Amino acid sequence: AEGSFDVQIQILEAGAASGIPVSGTAGAAGISGGDTTYVMPPERAVAALTRDILNRIPRRISDKDGHPGDMVNFVIVGSEERLKRAFENGGWVLVDRTKADAVVHTLISTLSKEEYVEMPMSELYLFGRPQDFGFAHADPYAVVATRHHLRVWKSASEVGGETLWVGAATHDVGFEKDQRNGSVTHKIDPDIDLEREYLARTLVASGVVTQWAHVTPENALTGAKTATGGSFHSDGRILVLVVGEGSSSGATSK
């Protein structure tokens, strides 16, 4: 899938902050409890992320047969090491890559009486290849049916000398029929912007994100169907995150 972006950076006034209610737990990010509000720092434009760079980013990912799927709804600027640290600090886990890995991990988890959150996710494609990494954030007891998850691809572009990673995040909320073959597949929350903002608050609270903002593409995608036939809708904005050295301890709640 192809697309072009006419970028508008949405920035809060200097010194402003927005309170975002958070439910559940975000691991080392320091967010816990259903009534906790983490105060997000203000959005700040990423000047090095030019329109030309954004124009080279496909609008959607696809399945192996080229059927368009989930919307690209976030990009991350930074090294692989810092990207992984941000996810780890934010309470996300790197999922297993293969079924063989899953069998071994499940056995170990069973023997140690631990829950298995890192189950593999299906391979979807961007830049002509499956995802480089998959991350999940879930209640282990409900992970079979519901899971926050995302896929990340390393792009060929750099922003200010740093790697540009491109991703798609969705929230599995149950099961539905795969319209391609009649099998059972995960159903995603059709309001995919909720998952984009869930990603924003868990990673910004990780202590590794140094800048964040939203960009609005020209002719923004506001609704479509996934490769399996499920529908989704969006305000069309894309989350931009820059990961730096940051703090290993994460942010605090108020």
Give each language-model segment a name.
Residues T98-S253:
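A cross-kingdom signal targeting lumenal/periplasmic-facing segments of multi-pass membrane
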Residues G3-V7, D70-V72, G90, H148:
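Envelope-exposed proteins and targeting segments
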Residues G3-P58:
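Charged, low-complexity intrinsically disordered tails and linkers
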Residues E2-G3, G66-P68, F127-R129, V144:
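Solvent-exposed loop and beta-edge segments used for protein-protein assembly and interaction
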